[in-house]
Swiss-Prot record:
Keywords: Apoptosis, Endoplasmic reticulum, Golgi apparatus, Lysosome, Membrane, Metal-binding, Transferase, Transmembrane, Transmembrane helix, Ubl conjugation, Ubl conjugation pathway, Zinc, Zinc-finger
Function, as annotated: Acts as an E3 ubiquitin ligase catalyzing the covalent attachment of ubiquitin moieties onto substrate proteins. Triggers apoptosis in response to prolonged ER stress by mediating the polyubiquitination and subsequent proteasomal degradation of BCL2L1. May collaborate with FATE1 to restrain BIK protein levels thus regulating apoptotic signaling.
InterPro entries, per the entry: RING_finger_E3_ubiq-ligases (IPR051435), Znf_RING (IPR001841), Znf_RING/FYVE/PHD (IPR013083), Znf_RING_CS (IPR017907)
EC number: 2.3.2.27
Record PTM: Autoubiquitinated (in vitro).
Protein's recorded name: E3 ubiquitin-protein ligase RNF183
Result after altering residue 59 to A: Abolishes autoubiquitination
């Protein structure tokens, strides 16, 4: 019982206490071999004055990052993911956002990838509210008319194409049934 409870304690980030997963709480290892979720490490890297050094929140041992290396490039704790029976996803840090591009696997047709983002806070020097000159001004937005290019993109959408194919098949079968009913009625009973 105590061993199982110890494993459950290991399966969560020691900073935010959220359970590890394979998205924004992916366990990343520092040089001291302590694991933290990528969200906590991203927050830590954004507030640290020395951008290339991360101090471990537990033992204070520094982890030196290469020039321009984000915290998402730190090694993933694969042993923890194996314990949780999860496969790692690639999470990237863009500015003050963590981004995850999830591409669902399908055998029959392509699906649009889903992109999940997690905002880590305001940009330094950014404003918290709307700019004062645009807050009082009201701007009327024109009605957008679909262009030739947007319709072309619509036709390239795999879900739309499958829908169009199914509707064409249903319409064809319906017309075939209607004509065959009238044809057999005229041929067999001589109506008309």
């Amino acid at each position: 019982m105590a061993e199982q409870q110890g494993r459950e304690l290991e399966a969560e980030c020691p900073v935010c206490w959220n359970p590890f997963n394979n998205t924004f709480h992916t366990p990343k290892m520092l040089d001291c071999c302590h694991s933290f979720c990528v969200e906590c490490l991203a927050h830590l890297s954004l507030v640290t004055p020395a951008r290339r050094r991360l101090l471990c929140p537990l033992c204070r041992q520094p982890t030196v990052l290469a020039s321009g290396q984000p915290v998402t490039d730190l090694p993933t704790d694969t042993a923890m993911l194996a314990l949780l029976r999860l496969e790692p996803h690639h999470v990237i840090l863009e500015g003050h956002q963590l981004c995850l591009k999830d591409q669902p696997k399908s055998r029959y047709f392509l699906r649009q990838p889903q992109v999940y983002t997690l905002d880590l806070g305001p940009q330094p020097g950014g404003q918290t509210g709307p700019p004062p000159d645009t807050a009082s001004a009201t701007v009327s937005t024109p009605i957008l008319i679909p262009s030739h290019h947007s319709l072309r993109e619509c036709f390239r959408n795999p879900q739309f194409r499958i829908f169009a194919y199914l509707m064409a098949v249903i319409l064809s079968v319906t017309l075939l049934l209607i004509f065959s009913i009238f044809w057999t009625k005229q041929f067999l009973w001589g109506v008309g």
